[in-house]
């Protein structure tokens, strides 16, 4: 039986690293009270940068075990991903070990972080196609799902970098497809809210304009 990944490293490092992150990037974070303080929850964000998980972490004091691609565990910062409780995911196939670790987090009432697109969005679309992993894990464990939208540019004292955390929704009684569709819809809404307030890059505004024309 898989063990829940440790979180003591997260608790130790997060206050210092998030302070540095906040001072350097000056991100705007909305919806700080929307991540439940206890109980099983899956935090899901669109994915544009390796530091996206920091933006959700700024909104809660509870540790979030993020699922991260296996390549990160072979590079210079492998120690960091292991120490902070990230779950190593082999994206080349069905990773049963990663799935078991994720289920262990949720079955113990923990917080799991997933990027449903599976990789950073490098397409011309507003967001990439969602995989079913996040919704499947949430439904299996009857966990709450929290949609998060990240827009803007990662640069020093950024005026556009913004994270907006949406209200959590229950997956109880939902099919995996229904949960996934709702998550996708909610994140698009949050992205559009960010852009409506001026938080975004020129490319994101262009994608949003193109998306609105397609959807009517």
State the predicted function of each range.
Residues 2-4, 8, 99-216:
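Non-catalytic C-terminal accessory region of glycerolipid acyltransferases
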Residues 9, 22, 36-93:
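Catalytic core of membrane glycerolipid acyltransferases/transacylases, capturing the structured
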Residues 11-21:
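N-terminal nucleotide/polyanion-binding subdomain common to many enzyme families
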Residues 16-17, 83-90, 118-122:
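Short, basic, glycine/proline-bearing loop/turn elements
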Residues 22-30:
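Short gly/ser/thr-rich secondary-structure transition/capping motifs
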Residues 25, 92-95, 127:
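A conditional alpha-helix N-cap/helix-loop micro-motif detector
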Residues 29, 43, 66, 86, ...:
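Generic preference for hydrophobic
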Residues 29-30, 87-90, 171:
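Short acidic-hydrophobic, aromatic-tinged amphipathic segments that line or gate anion-handling sites
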């Amino acid at each position: 039986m898989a063990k829940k990944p440790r979180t003591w490293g997260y608790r130790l490092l997060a206050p210092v690293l998030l302070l540095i992150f906040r001072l350097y990037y000056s991100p705007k974070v909305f919806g700080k009270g929307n991540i439940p303080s206890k109980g099983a929850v899956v935090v899901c964000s669109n994915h544009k940068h390796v530091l996206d998980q920091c933006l959700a972490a700024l909104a809660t004091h509870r540790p979030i075990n993020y699922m991260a691609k296996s390549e990160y565990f072979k590079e210079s910062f492998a120690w960091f991903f292991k120490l902070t409780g990230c779950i190593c995911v082999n994206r080349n196939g069905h990773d049963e070990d990663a799935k078991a670790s994720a289920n262990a987090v949720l079955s113990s009432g923990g917080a799991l972080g997933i990027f449903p697109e599976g990789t950073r969005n490098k397409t011309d679309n507003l967001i990439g196609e969602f995989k079913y992993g996040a919704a499947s894990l949430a439904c299996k464990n009857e966990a709450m799902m929290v949609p998060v939208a990240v827009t803007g540019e990662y640069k020093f004292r950024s005026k556009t970098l913004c994270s907006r955390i949406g209200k959590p929704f229950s997956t109880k009684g939902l099919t995996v497809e229904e949960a996934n569709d709702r998550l996708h819809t909610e994140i698009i809404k949050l992205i559009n809210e960010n852009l409506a307030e001026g938080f975004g890059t020129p490319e994101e505004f262009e994608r949003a304009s193109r998306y609105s024309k397609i959807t009517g």
